[in-house]
């Protein structure tokens, strides 16, 4: 995986310490004792918040064969072993690679791994079900001034956007649980746990209030922008725009020069992110196989 390197710390955090990791699902190919290929397979052993166990679904989050060992049938043997493992665990669907909580990338990079993508679709019958993209923006010269009137209009309508105060955590979590995906709840909770330990700041989460009720939020972790969302009945009123502006400005104030989004759709990219200088950096194919 030449464009997706990881270090040992990331491997431990995202693989060995994942609550769903099962050593039998990490299928490894060796040649004379040396690892030349692998396939990481996962099924849920603990439920995901607001989703549950997904008992019919499994995921492949990483797969690779060493360049010098390719075209010897190793990749096919690994994939056949992976599919057999999923059948043994009574799965009826396998996806590459939108697993939460610890996916590496949304799917197969259509440019960097074009041969692998073609191999998966033609040889093993995977179908492309989505083509999300990653985006990056240089925020050094980002100017929040043009959005001041919009924020003032929201305040006049009773909506205020501000950093999350620790005392408002219960209201914030209640909003997240009621209105946003379970994995976003997890993201926010993990950032708050880091803040409680002194490893992050509560001001890395911006919230929108309507009266005494949280109606939207935006967060960042280093240069990673998002997730962010607004209550469905209040979307289209500029709340998300102001949250995004406040969040990007907070990132600049911390000395960050860039912001990146790992996973979004074309519609969201064009409607929201492009307006703030985000540009596509990678394109992925999310794959699925059913039986």
What residue spans do the PLM features occupy?
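A short beta-loop-alpha structural element at the N-terminal edge
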Residues: 159-172
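Conserved hydrophobic beta-strand within the GNAT/NAT acetyltransferase core sheet
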Residues: 60, 94-97, 225, 259-263
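Conserved acetyl-CoA-binding loop-helix of GNAT-fold acetyltransferases
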Residues: 65, 71-88, 230, 236-249, ...
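Acyl-donor-binding surface of acyltransferase catalytic domains
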Residues: 47, 71, 79-156, 285-289
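A short, internal acetyl-CoA/4′-phosphopantetheine-binding micro-motif in the GNAT/acyltransferase core
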Residues: 60-70, 99-102, 225-236
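Active-site rim helix/loop that mediates acceptor-substrate recognition in acyltransferases
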Residues: 2-32, 36-49, 177-214
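Conserved GNAT-family N-acetyltransferase fold
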Residues: 27, 37-41, 58, 63, ...
């Amino acid at each position: 995986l030449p464009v997706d390197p990881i270090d040992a710390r990331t491997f431990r955090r995202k693989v060995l310490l994942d609550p769903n990791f099962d050593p039998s699902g990490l299928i490894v190919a060796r040649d004379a004792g040396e690892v030349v290929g692998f396939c990481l397979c996962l099924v849920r052993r603990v439920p995901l918040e607001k989703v549950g166990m997904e008992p019919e679904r499994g995921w492949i989050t990483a797969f690779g064969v060493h360049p010098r060992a390719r075209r010897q049938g190793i990749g096919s043997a690994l994939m056949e072993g992976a599919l057999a493992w999923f059948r043994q665990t009574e799965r009826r669907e396998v996806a590459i690679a939108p697993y939460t909580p610890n996916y590496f990338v949304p799917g197969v990079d259509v440019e960097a791994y074009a041969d692998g993508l073609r191999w998966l679709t033609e040889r093993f019958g995977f179908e492309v079900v989505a083509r999300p993209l990653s985006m990056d923006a240089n925020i050094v010269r980002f100017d929040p001034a043009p959005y001041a009137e919009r924020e003032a209009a929201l305040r006049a309508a009773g909506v205020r956007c501000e950093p999350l105060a620790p005392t408002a955590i219960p209201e914030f979590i209640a909003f997240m649980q009621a209105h946003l995906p379970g994995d976003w709840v997890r993201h926010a909770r993990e950032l708050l746990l880091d803040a409680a330990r002194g490893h992050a700041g509560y001001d890395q989460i911006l919230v929108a209030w309507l009266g005494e009720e949280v109606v939207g939020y935006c967060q960042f972790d280093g240069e990673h922008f998002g997730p962010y969302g607004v209550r469905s009945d209040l979307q289209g009123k500029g709340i998300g725009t102001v949250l995004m502006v406040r969040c990007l400005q907070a990132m600049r104030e911390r000395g960050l020069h860039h912001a990146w989004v790992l996973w979004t759709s074309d519609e969201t990219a064009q409607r929201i992110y492009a307006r703030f200088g985000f540009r596509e950096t990678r394109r992925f194919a999310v794959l699925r196989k059913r039986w």
